[in-house]
């Protein structure tokens, strides 16, 4: 299983993606339906045998939009982006720029209703799609994919192996947790039209009189980022627990590990809050 998403209009109704069987639907705590290659808009990667058709329907990156449409990634198929509408009907959006990308981990919508997607595995990167106000007509859409090489503010080119997670902060910037630490896209509005977007590295002064600084979490596998209502950055790592960083990312406010907190492991897979603060 990849992830679950709750129906925003019905907290007893939710969907769960899978790595091969399609999309599971649950209602009132009970299994309701399996959406797969023969009863939905989803496709299988392999179609040579019945077994392969039933076990290679890969679904991830579940996300509802403002109109109640459920978006998802039907990974490793030609038309990766699939949408199930509130009435149960389906459609897909094909983009040549996304063809062949192996796995999408997230689909999120920004304040301007643009779609942001992070690609993982052997072609990691960040994609943005502007639907131009026409949901099912992608002929007028604008799209950009950037990766796996990112240019930072020092004009250094860094090649990443994975984007584990991203999140929007209250200033509109996008913070990305990668296998090489944290990157920040400061100007998402111009990402689609910019042939050379800059992915900023937060610099942490060494404070040793040298005037030198190091990139935030340089060389550290950062597995998750969650930005709270105070605009603070919660950053999960592969083997060093959770760091709570200041709004600008330059100051460590807390560092939680198995030795000083109830964390059962220092390998952090997800971070969220209870919505009460």
Please give the residue ranges for each predicted region.
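Surface-exposed loop and turn segments in beta-propeller and other repeat-based domains
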Residues: 1, 30-55, 91-100, 134-159, ...
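Long, internal scaffold/assembly segments composed of regular secondary structure
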Residues: 3-5, 14-15, 68, 74, ...
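Signature of short aromatic-glycine-proline-rich micro-motifs recurring in repeat-based ectodomains
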Residues: 1-4, 20, 47-63, 101-106, ...
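Short loop/turn segments immediately following the C-termini of beta-strands
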Residues: 18-20, 28, 60, 67, ...
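Conserved beta-propeller blade signature
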Residues: 12-17, 24, 69-73, 114-118, ...
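Residue-level detector of Asp-centered blade-edge/turn motifs that repeat once per structural unit
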Residues: 6-11, 64-67, 109-113, 168-171, ...
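Short loop/turn segments that connect beta-strands within beta-propeller blades
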Residues: 27-30, 84-88, 130-134, 187-190, ...
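Long, C-terminal catalytic modules of enzymes
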Residues: 230-231, 235-237, 244-247
